[in-house]
Structure formats: structure tokens, C-alpha cells
């Protein structure tokens, strides 16, 4: 049995990149997050919050981190998100996908994905 928490299409407020006059400036940055967690937090015997992984604090930390200052690259923000995921003992592995839109006039997305397996995430926790 495997279980995941999946967050899709979260538009985050952030300031990424430096653009010159005439360059396309993205209007949105979108985050997808897939967290592998123990099935014991999903396959539960009672309908109680203390039986599940409370992801709201993690989302709040991600939003705060994303909006706190300027980033030159999506990669740096993804790295910070990876460390935030590692702060949660319930998270076993993570798949983080951050993309921006548009990348050419009115079209296209460009994204960066980081997949962190159990061993790599454990290394971030220490």
C-alpha cells in the first residue's frame, strides 16, 4: 500500500527572474507537489485530524517562503521547498514541480521538477 498527498495548480505569489524591456514576464508561477507519506496517515480507522498528515502548515510555509524576497531562479525556490518538506517527519519522499506562464507572448509554460526519494529526503532532514 502506498499513499500520497497531492497539491496541484497552486498559484503562488513570488518574484522570480530578472527581465529586460521587451522580454516576456511570466504572469503566474504554479506549484504541483506530490508528497509520499505513510499509508497510516491515509488509511485510517477513525475520522480524526490527529490521524492524518496536516498539510496546511506546510502550504503556509511554502507560500511565505515564495513571497519572501526575490529569486533569480525557480531552482532556488524549489530547493527551499524541498527543505520545508523535509521538516515534516510524515513526508517520506517528494516530487516538486514549479512552472511559469507564459514563456513566449501569451503561451507556453516552462517548469522545473525535483524528485526527492526517501534516502535523499532523509539526508535533508539531518
What are the functions of these language-model segments?
Residues 1-126:
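N-terminal, polar/charged subdomain of small-to-medium soluble alpha/beta proteins
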Amino acid at each position: 500500500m502506498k499513499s500520497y498527498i497531492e497539491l496541484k495548480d497552486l498559484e503562488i505569489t513570488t518574484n522570480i527572474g530578472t527581465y529586460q524591456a521587451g522580454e516576456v514576464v511570466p504572469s503566474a508561477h504554479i506549484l504541483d507537489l506530490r508528497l509520499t507519506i505513510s499509508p497510516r496517515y491515509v488509511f485510517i480507522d477513525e475520522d480524526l485530524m490527529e490521524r492524518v498528515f496536516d498539510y496546511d502548515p506546510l502550504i503556509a510555509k511554502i507560500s511565505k517562503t515564495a513571497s519572501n524576497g526575490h529569486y533569480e531562479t525557480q531552482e532556488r525556490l524549489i530547493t527551499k521547498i524541498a527543505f520545508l518538506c523535509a521538516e515534516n517527519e510524515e513526508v517520506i519522499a517528494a516530487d516538486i514541480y514549479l512552472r511559469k506562464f507564459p514563456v513566449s507572448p501569451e503561451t507556453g509554460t516552462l517548469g522545473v521538477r525535483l524528485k526527492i526519494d526517501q534516502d535523499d529526503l532523509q539526508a535533508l532532514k539531518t
